[in-house]
UniProtKB/Swiss-Prot annotation:
Organism field: Bacillus subtilis (strain 168)
Gene3D superfamilies: 3.40.50.1100
Binding site for pyridoxal 5'-phosphate: 75, 179-183, 267
Keyword Repeat: no
Gene designation per UniProt: cysK
Annotated CDD domains: CBS_like
Protein name: Cysteine synthase
Length: 308
């Protein structure tokens, strides 16, 4: 249906699902991707940007002219900056200096202020800096890693959308990368209720296998693998953890672009790789859905899409 919206924020959600045709082999389960880059800010994080700001407005913690500060690996910041611009709020984003140039420039384009922290300190360094600045100036911190509005919006929207999109068809597996854990927690809980036999797979970087009980470490899969177990992550919702190597994520993001015309980011490559492995295991006649969190255009300055 063609929509005429009163605000850009009304266009968040209701993202399409597409089937992979050339990457999956014929003896595997069918693999589907939910294209979260079809949100107006080009990522899944638009959903939580809107949810966290609107929850704070309802609670009286935010009003026009106020300042939001958030530690973010990029896409949450873009979602928050977009929603803040639409609502007349000021946004300051704190992120590790390892994040791509596109992300930084996009934030500035939306009118946000940027504070960069040392990449070696990871998200922990960004969180610490944001908390210091918030305390000093009285800014509002949405705190995506422990804000209940984060998984809740995925219960209310993402999970419900998937059930509506698949209807009475059985969905056999759901694959999502873990950044804050909001998507897998919220959508996963709804999917378990709708499809009791579904298997849910949590994707994390092999080089920072914290959910698997390993040690945090540097990795190249931007947006997932924060190096700690987030407060809002329901660790009971997933059945299996799927570690993905940097090279696997890069290879499958590139292949999806070249062979399917689907241009995702690095964590999208990780989700696609994991979904294809799950599909092989499940076999023909089953259905696997993976979340594609962001658009590959956001990674053109990274090693993901460098050409001679």
């Amino acid at each position: 249906m063609v929509r005429v919206a009163n605000s850009i924020t009304e266009l968040i959600g209701n993202t399409p699902i597409v089937k992979l045709n050339r990457l999956a082999d014929e003896n595997s389960a069918d693999v589907y991707l939910k294209l979260e880059y079809m949100n107006p800010g080009s990522s899944v994080k638009d959903r939580i940007g809107l949810a966290m700001i609107e929850a704070a407005e309802k609670e009286g913690k935010l009003k026009a002219g106020n300042t939001i500060i958030e530690p973010t690996s990029g896409n949450t910041g873009i979602g928050l900056a977009m929603v803040a611009a639409a609502k007349g709020l000021k946004a300051i984003l704190v992120m590790p200096d390892t994040m791509s140039m596109e992300r930084r420039n996009l934030l500035r384009a939306y009118g946000a202020e940027l504070v960069l922290t040392p990449g070696a300190e990871g998200m922990k360094g960004a969180i610490k800096k944001a908390e210091e600045l918030a305390e000093k100036h009285g800014y509002f911190v949405p705190q995506q890693f422990n804000n209940p509005s984060n998984p809740e919006i995925h219960r209310q929207t993402t999970g419900k959308e998937i059930v509506e999109q698949f209807g009475d068809d059985q969905l056999d597996a759901f694959v999502a990368g873990i950044g804050t854990g909001g998507t897998i927690t919220g959508a996963g809980e709804v999917l378990k209720e709708a499809y009791p036999s579904i298997k849910i797979y949590a994707v994390e970087p092999s080089d920072s296998p914290v959910l698997s009980g390993g040690k945090p470490g540097p990795h190249k899969i931007q947006g997932i693998g924060a190096g700690f177990v987030p407060d809002i992550l329901n660790t009971e919702v997933y059945d299996e953890i799927f570690p993905v190597k940097n090279e696997e994520a890069f290879e499958y993001a590139r292949r999806a672009a070249r062979e399917e015309g689907i241009l995702g980011g690095i964590s999208s490559g990780a989700a696609i790789y994991a979904a294809l492995q799950v599909a092989k295991k499940l076999g023909k006649g089953k259905k696997v859905l993976a979340i594609i969190p962001s658009n590959g255009e956001r990674y053109l300055s990274t090693p993901l899409y460098q050409f001679d």
